[in-house]
Amino acid sequence: MIGGIEMNSEINAFINKYVKEIRNNNAAFFAGAGFSKESGYVDWKTLLESIASELGLEVEKEHDLVALAQYCYNKHQNRGIINDVIFEEFSKQKEPTQNHRILARLPIGVIWTTNYDDLIEKAFDNVQKIVDVKSRNEHLSNTLANRECILYKMHGDKNNPNDAILIKDDYERYYKAHKQFLSALTGDLISKTFLFVGFSFQDPNLDYILSRIRVDYEENPRQHYAIMKSIDRKDYESDADYDYAKRRNDLFLEDLKRYRISALVIDDFSEITEILQEIERRLNQNNIFISGSAEEYGVFTKEEAENLIKLLSARLIQDEFNIISGFGVGVGSAVITGALEEIYMHNTRINNQRLLLRPFPQGKEARVLWQQYREDMISRAGISLYIFG
């Protein structure tokens, strides 16, 4: 079981594989429009509803939404209405969903998205992690110091609606106007294992890249995964319509295998959260939160207690566990010293995965922040160890 859902062997195998890839820094994540829908932002159809109405069309009857946006541009010969729609919708303040928060906590170094919103950025900020956002060509040559993740917003950002990728002209020019993004995405698809969530695979740019990779790397392609919702009977008026949609979807999912994308089919969107939670849980099994605060150590002298803590910390690092510490008085410094000595002894690079430090805040506002700090540290740990109080 994963939470409340029955975990089939395919999903279980995927989670084991993806956790391994995350630990080896070989994982990437792709967030489509469906990833932000739970936050209250609209999907593409709803976003373009007013545009369709202005054209005398019904958005529910339109399947090519890129063409619909292009028709609006053709009519007015400018992007004014389209930009207004994007700005009006995404200027609304929304909070990251649980899925965004889990994603931000996961040690994934590369995230791609077609979304214009800033929910991923907010989620990273909430867990005090530095994310390097790339939404324009000029951003690609800049490197943010101490970044923990790169977020590629390949269709632009809500703050620059005029540059957002939405109409046919944008897609047709993308290979030339944004070839740097295509090159970066191609490299990641070749070298990393992707998990696609909330993505429909109707994007012409991604289709182009996947086709090229399939041809160029046919002998040894990278395996990717996509969480896809099953076809629901209640969404269709008749059994015949449902059977047709299901048959077409089955053929579509089978076709994804040509690009080495395995579909993980779920019945309810809540299962996305439970799968992400299980990924985080398995990752955290190797993370140990060591806490304690002491001025006296009972039957131990101060030197004996510190040596014990240092030996424990060093042995945990030696056995491939990761340590999380809040730098508690009388305990935290020994935890850090033991871990660092073991890391340096083996010439290993220090990073937030091996040793994550979250010193507790001091001063008048400390109490306000303490709860947030505790929740952040404990959420990253699979085991909690309390020493000397």
Residue ranges and their predicted role:
Residues 269-294, 304-312:
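Charge-rich interaction segments
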Residues 31-33, 155-156, 229-230, 287-295, ...:
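Short loop/turn segments at strand-loop or loop-helix junctions that form parts
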Residues 296-298, 304-389:
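Acidic/glycine-enriched connector segments
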Residues 87-91, 300, 323:
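Conserved short-loop catalytic and cofactor-binding motifs
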Residues 33-35, 51, 117, 294, ...:
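Short glycine-rich, polar/acidic loop-and-turn segments at beta strand-coil junctions
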Residues 78-80, 163-164, 290-292, 381-383:
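A short alpha-helix capping/helix-coil boundary motif
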Residues 2-284, 342-345:
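Conserved catalytic-core helix/loop/strand module for nucleotide-ribose chemistry
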